[in-house]
């Protein structure tokens, strides 16, 4: 027994100064440490291990719950089989895991694997440094942020906000339920829209871009090929470098500008007179 320590139970050991061990085969070896439960093991000074097979492995660590483990300095593990394995890590919830320094995992089976990462929600996963995943089954990569049920920010520096939103490649942004930004640098904002070309922008519910640098602005707008631009509800720029301006406008051929469609034409008015030159 350590000085002024207490051990209660079969094969119980309280070796640290002023330590406390209660339960069969419980062990408290750190000074001022506490081990409560069968096979509980409190190693660090001022640490607390409570629950069958609960374990602390460093100073000021706290483990509460069956088979919980707080192995890093000042780490905290709360919940059955929760595991905070690095310094200052925190795992809250059954089978949660915070496996990097300063990582925080909150929720059943949540996992924060990167330094300074945060996973909040059932089965959420912050897989790399500075990742933030908030929402059931959300996922985030390095420096990425995913917020919402099943949201995924899989690319470096990507952002996915909304249930089922996906920012799949580096530097992408998907904002809105079921929105998808799946090419490098793409931006998708709105419900159920998709930006599928590099540096493409899809803004508006149900808008879609399918080409590099394409832009679709407006509900249900579509810019399908490289450098296409569609502005307005249901506007459709189908050709390469084409432009569709106004609700329902359709530009089917490459390098064309459309302000209407085959059944609804528009006039372009209030234009200044042009200049006449030898190249006009």
Language-model segments: which ranges?
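Small/polar residue-rich beta-strand/coil "junction" motifs that cap repeat-based extracellular fibers
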Residues: 1-10, 17-41, 45-109, 115-280
């Amino acid at each position: 027994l350590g000085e002024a320590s207490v051990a209660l139970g079969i094969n119980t050991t309280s070796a640290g100064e002023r330590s406390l061990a209660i339960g069969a085969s419980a062990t408290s070896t750190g000074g001022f440490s506490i081990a409560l439960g069968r096979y509980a093991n409190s190693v660090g000074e001022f640490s607390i291990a409570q629950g069958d097979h609960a374990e602390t492995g460093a100073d000021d660590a706290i483990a509460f719950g069956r088979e919980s483990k707080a192995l890093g300095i000042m780490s905290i593990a709360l919940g059955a089989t929760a595991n905070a394995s690095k310094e200052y890590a925190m795992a809250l919830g059954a089978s949660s895991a915070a496996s990097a320094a300063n990582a925080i995992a909150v929720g059943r089976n949540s996992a924060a694997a990167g330094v300074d990462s945060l996973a909040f929600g059932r089965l959420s996963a912050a897989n790399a440094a500075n990742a933030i995943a908030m929402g059931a089954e959300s996922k985030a990569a390095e420096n990425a942020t995913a917020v919402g049920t099943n949201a995924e920010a899989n690319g470096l520096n990507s952002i996915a906000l909304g249930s089922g939103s996906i920012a799949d490649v580096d530097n992408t942004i998907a904002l809105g339920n079921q929105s998808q930004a799946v090419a490098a640098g793409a931006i998708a904002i709105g419900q159920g829209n998709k930006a599928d070309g590099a540096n493409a922008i899809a803004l508006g519910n149900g808008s879609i871009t399918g080409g590099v640098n394409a832009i679709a602005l407006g509900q249900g707008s579509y810019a399908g090929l490289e450098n296409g631009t569609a502005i307005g509800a249901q506007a459709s720029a189908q050709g390469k470098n084409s432009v569709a301006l106004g609700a329902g406008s359709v530009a089917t051929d490459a390098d064309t500008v459309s302000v209407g469609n085959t059944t609804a034409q528009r006039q372009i008015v209030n234009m200044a007179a042009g200049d006449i030159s030898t190249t006009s």
